[in-house]
Amino acid sequence: MADKLGIYIHIPFCRSKCDYCDFYSLAGRDDRMDQYQKALLSHIKETAPLAQDFPVDTIYIGGGTPSYYGAKRLKELLGVIRKLYKVEKDAEVTVECNPDSVDVKSLKILRKAGVNRLSMGMQSANACELERIHRIHTPQQVNEAATAARKAGFTNLSLDLIYGLPGQTMDSWKDTVEHALSLIPQHLSCYGLKVEEGTPLAARVAQGEVLPDDDQQADLYLWTVGRLERAGYPQYEISNFAKPGFASRHNLRYWLTQPYIGFGPGAHSDFGGRRYSFVRDLDAYIQGVLQGGDIIDESEIIPKRERCGEYLMLRLRTVQG
């Protein structure tokens, strides 16, 4: 039997870019959405014959902000994938969203399109902390978005939180975690803030802005592990916690070195014994796909011995090891 396959689709568009973000994402390029959709559909169709023997058990649409891209475009993408790929009936289909770009109407469109898991970027329940990292949603919008998700029929909601934010204290972090728990998600991802080179946050730190140090971050992390365990969200990976049966199947495939195919600028793939990524340039990606040009940024064949080593190291990220 062929290995099961995951599909990742990168949506690089955002309403506003956060100060800490190092992912390939763009604000102010909405004029390219239609052409990008055309390129994505073309790329997905071109690749389908290569994956025809592989059952697809996870689909993940990340960004950027997929919910800002529009539910109707996402529905079209998923429709083509279901038509051309062997998507299993119980496949996990995740869409990332921000609280300010969803409502019941758009979420119902996604639910009817087969999306069965939402990953929402909450980050903090503190308005001042959100403003300091240039997040444009409010804590109240998180509440409204979570309610909208339930009304739309979603029963698998994940919330992303960040600890170590500028000005964050143990008390404010505890408030954020408790707020998140009050929304009764099925999954929580809690990430330590990383200052990535080239981001506005890195420039602020270089100019003297002080962040919680490593010891403070460690205290926040250890408290989180204990609190979420007691709340019924056992840890299954360094940054991830879930109610039983709700671990992210797509993210697990990365840590278990299972095959996946990516689409979009900056997207990575590990398929057919080869690991490769596409150019981190929206216009170059669109032009390359639609005009038959080269869109590969990096590509390598991974020797079996190296794969074994990677498997062991990545497994160490998980609680099972």
Can you describe what each PLM-predicted range is?
Residues 9:
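Conserved N-terminal Rossmann-fold NAD(P)-binding element of oxidoreductases
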Residues 12-25:
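Local cysteine-cluster metal-coordination motifs and their immediate loop/turn environment
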Residues 2-5, 25-49, 54-321:
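C-terminal scaffold of the Radical SAM
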